[in-house]
Swiss-Prot record:
Presence of the UniProt keyword Cell cycle in the record: no
GO terms under cellular component: plasma membrane
GO molecular function, one term: membrane insertase activity
Biological source species: Methylococcus capsulatus (strain ATCC 33009 / NCIMB 11132 / Bath)
UniProt subcellular location: Cell inner membrane
Subunit structure: Interacts with the Sec translocase complex via SecD. Specifically interacts with transmembrane segments of nascent integral membrane proteins during membrane integration.
Protein name: Membrane protein insertase YidC
GO terms of biological process kind: protein insertion into membrane; protein transport
Gene: yidC
Family (UniProt): Belongs to the OXA1/ALB3/YidC family. Type 1 subfamily.
Ranges where the record places region Disordered: 32-69
Membrane topology: Multi-pass membrane protein
Amino acid sequence: MDNLRFVLFVFFIFLSFLLWEQWQIDYGPKPQAVAQTDGASRPAGDLPQRPSDDESDVTVHTEAPTQEGSRRIRVHTDVLSLEIDTRGGDLRQLDLLNYPVSKEQPDRPVRLLTDQGDIFVAQSGFIGAAQQVPNHHSLWQAEAGEYRLQDGQDILRVPLTWSDGQGVTVTKTYILRRGSYLIDMEQTIDNRSNTNWTGRQYMQLQRKEPTSAQEDSQFIRTYTGGVLHTEDKSYEKIAFKDMASGNLDAKSRQGWIAMIQHYFLAAWVPPAEDESTFYTKALADRVFVIGAYSPPAEVPAGSSQTLKARLFAGPKLQHVLEGIAPGLELTADFGILTVIAKPIYWLLETFHGFFNNWGWAIIFVTLVIKALFFKLSEASYRSMANMRKLQPKLVELKERYGEDRQRYNQAMMELYRKEKVNPLGGCLPILVQIPVFISLYWVLVESVDLRQAPFLLWLDDLSSKDPYFVLPLIMGVSMFIQQRLNPPPTDPIQARVMQFFPLVFTVFFLFFPSGLVLYWVVNNILSIIQQWYITRQIEKNTARA
């Protein structure tokens, strides 16, 4: 019993250390970004490869990229501010206006897409006959230099045009909507030439591996990298190292590709009915591409055709992502314990709907979890109380048999059988709480809803550490009290080591998200009340007997 409890406590400390280490990776100071040249000057090697099964006379159009004649088109909605480069029609900068970088910088929005430093841009174009199709190095024309969603306006259309000078005109239109992070893209091919037009639409995300991604953790961690969804695999991570080791080549309907990071993502969603081909490429300087291209489209001379795709660039709002594409909500990555984490998230959302405060939602989720495990905890606490009652007899056995461990263990097990006490019963709450603890950790870390969410008084961001360490100190005190209610180990070395556990946990929890510490404090307080009551009842019954 003592050894098992000791091992469980050591394991829990190790688990806490690994979670703390990952929190430091996610929230700690990042290394200075290395200056990077503008992504528009990259070589044409970032274009998709010619499809291996395409037998037509098709080549990848490799118009030399240059900045000459290009300009930036600025687009503003109520939730997005972005820049589109006429060189390629790329989305080269995108700010999320409702998500400030930090509480200290409320007027500085998160910049999800950028072509500076660690570049992250969204690109699109066509694969087809040379000089007959535009790609993301081609020069497009725009009617205006700025587009803004006006009061009373719900839809904003941003058109760009390209012509081959031989009768083929392509119009790329970005369609943005009020309150939405979803951008529809329509590419209309108007073929007024004398020959049929053939091409494949592609859309891709080009990103430099962030400096922080070079730090490795041997435990589950917040993921930054590529993601693929197909009919066969609902959520497949394509890490930067996977892209570096080999190119992806997969076909599927109802698929999508994405680059995700903490709280936010950008994802291209091709038409669900098309069998798209999904690919990756590794470029120089740790720059990677993940994308998709469509089946070949043929536009006869004298006709036109519109090809569509959707780009989501914004926060990982699960209820929003569920309505865009199957499996897209999984980008809020709760890890291997998603089956537990999703109900916890649903409970949090439900209570937040009542209280409009994520702190109170966490407290009431804790109450629900405690209620679900009440009977289990009651049985465990009764076992621990009975163990505490047996403590004098165990000490007596220890003194009687001294260093003879075999005889001592035999006598101890005989005592347990005689008193009808389960020595393992007190360990069950710890085992049960570990997956719940991990699941809640990832819900708090991954859910953008809780990002910078205030609670009360000094707790103005439940996703970050307590600035004054009040909650971790309260948690340490609660652990100390709870430890006093438990039977101490008969082994003096283990007893001395376990005395330091509240202090060690307090140090670890100093740097944990305050929302997680809030859960642990409330859980400990409820456990103390329950355990104290059960112990008191057993002591009263013993006194009467």
